[in-house]
Amino acid sequence: MLPEPININKWIEENGHLLQPPVNNYCLHRGGFTIMIVGGPNERTDYHINETPEHFHQLKGAMCLKVVDDGEFRDIIINEGDSFLLPGNTPHNPVRFADTIGLVVEQDRPETALDRLRWYCSNCREIVHEAAFHLTDLGTQIKEAILAFDGDKESRTCKKCGTLNYSKPQ
């Protein structure tokens, strides 16, 4: 039997408290693709690299999608009501502000696919650390990788300039 439609606005009213740091997401659907509600604010400095495309739709407020586009760091502002399809293999850091909510759709990963979280030096933009893993649970694995980075001072220290980096903006 098919499930009933979900009223997204009602779901947010009743379940907004489930959107907790550091990722602030809640998976509404899994199977073929994942549909997530993501709230703000978030506090992350990592850039996610997903081999498959990601679709962002901003339901409330605006967000800033920091990307590395052909080697250049730039910001893409996604305003309330806007949708944006991010191509696969694009390093991105979704910056969500307070009292904002978005919907993100991601394709299930092929068994050979690796997701990566990459941290760039806050001072010189060199790659400081990268964690790679086959993603099976968006709700837990990204958080685990962030916490592991945060707990490893050597991984957070830039080999080029010596700057100590953090998993949260300072």
UniProtKB/Swiss-Prot annotation:
Q: Where does O2 bind?
A: R44
Named cofactor requirement(s): Fe(2+)
Cellular compartments annotated = Cytoplasm
For this UniProt record, give its keywords in alphabetical order, as a comma-separated list.
Cytoplasm, Dioxygenase, Iron, Metal-binding, Oxidoreductase, Pyridine nucleotide biosynthesis
Q: Does the keyword Oxidoreductase apply?
A: yes
Q: Does the keyword Transmembrane apply?
A: no
Q: Please tell me where a divalent metal cation binds in this chain.
A: C121, C124, C158, C161
The record's section on SUPFAM superfamilies has: RmlC-like cupins
Q: What is its main location?
A: cytoplasm
Q: Please list the disulfide bridges.
A: none
Question: Tell me, which GO biological process terms does this entry list?
Answer: 'de novo' NAD biosynthetic process from L-tryptophan; anthranilate metabolic process; L-tryptophan catabolic process; quinolinate biosynthetic process
User: A Gene Ontology CC term for this entry?
Assistant: cytoplasm
Q: Which residues bind substrate?
A: E54, R96, E106
Q: What is its EC number?
A: 1.13.11.6
Specify the pathway: Cofactor biosynthesis; NAD(+) biosynthesis; quinolinate from L-kynurenine: step 3/3
One annotated GO molecular function: 3-hydroxyanthranilate 3,4-dioxygenase activity
Reaction(s) the record says it catalyses: 3-hydroxyanthranilate + O2 = (2Z,4Z)-2-amino-3-carboxymuconate 6-semialdehyde
Annotated Fe cation binding sites: H48, E54, H92
What does this protein's UniProt record list under function?
Catalyzes the oxidative ring opening of 3-hydroxyanthranilate to 2-amino-3-carboxymuconate semialdehyde, which spontaneously cyclizes to quinolinate.
The entry assigns this protein to a family as follows: Belongs to the 3-HAO family.
The protein's matches in PANTHER family, at most eight in alphabetical order, are given as:
3-HYDROXYANTHRANILATE 3,4-DIOXYGENASE (PTHR15497:SF1)
Name the record gives this protein: 3-hydroxyanthranilate 3,4-dioxygenase
Species this chain originates from? Scheffersomyces stipitis (strain ATCC 58785 / CBS 6054 / NBRC 10063 / NRRL Y-11545)
